Amino acid sequence: MVQVVEVLVPGGQASPGPPLGPAIGPLGLNVKQVVDKINEATKDYEGLSVPVKIIVKDDRSFEIEVGIPPVSALIKRELGIEKGASNPGREVVGNLTMEQLLNIARIKRQQSLSYTLKEVVKEVLGTCNSMGITVEGKSPKELTRMIEEGQVEIPEE
């Protein structure tokens, strides 16, 4: 029988303590080995919370599947901010460039159900809106409308 453990760990900095240790200890795995493998797999996402699936097989072997951090975490890393606005809509805490927006959308596209980059960009803009982030000085709602009307082109890759 295969067991799956899902945890959210800091990229490249997982430790044997909670949430990891208590989740995998009872399964009979070498916790240090699992932690080392997770840290190796998540080192590119240092400073971000990363969803990780640990797939444990009957013979106590395991596989690690690394997910993509939430869009909000990618935005915060791109802007170098700690948190979004406490009063989005009235408060602006950062401004992304169009290139930064496209980079975040490209990263998230691997996990999104949307078919086109344009649709993923609109998903990211929704998160920007709820965090108090503008793009090129424009509100995310305004930019979404401009994309819909064809005033702003999103390249297809």
UniProtKB/Swiss-Prot annotation:
Ribonucleoprotein keyword on record: yes
Keyword flag Translocase: no
Stored CDD domains: Ribosomal_L11 (cd00349)
Gene3D superfamilies with a match to the protein in the record: Ribosomal protein L11, C-terminal domain, Ribosomal protein L11/L12, N-terminal domain
GO BP: translation
One Pfam family here: Ribosomal_L11
Domain of life: Archaea
InterPro entries cross-referenced by the UniProt entry: Ribosomal_uL11 (IPR000911), Ribosomal_uL11_C (IPR020783), Ribosomal_uL11_C_sf (IPR036769), Ribosomal_uL11_CS (IPR020785), Ribosomal_uL11_N (IPR020784), Ribosomal_uL11_N_sf (IPR036796)
GO molecular function: large ribosomal subunit rRNA binding; structural constituent of ribosome
Gene Ontology cellular-component annotations: large ribosomal subunit
UniProt keyword terms in alphabetical order: Ribonucleoprotein, Ribosomal protein, RNA-binding, rRNA-binding
Subunit structure: Part of the ribosomal stalk of the 50S ribosomal subunit. Interacts with L10 and the large rRNA to form the base of the stalk. L10 forms an elongated spine to which L12 dimers bind in a sequential fashion forming a multimeric L10(L12)X complex.
Role this protein plays: Forms part of the ribosomal stalk which helps the ribosome interact with GTP-bound translation factors.
Family of this protein: Belongs to the universal ribosomal protein uL11 family.
Protein name: Large ribosomal subunit protein uL11
Organism: Archaeoglobus fulgidus (strain ATCC 49558 / DSM 4304 / JCM 9628 / NBRC 100126 / VC-16)
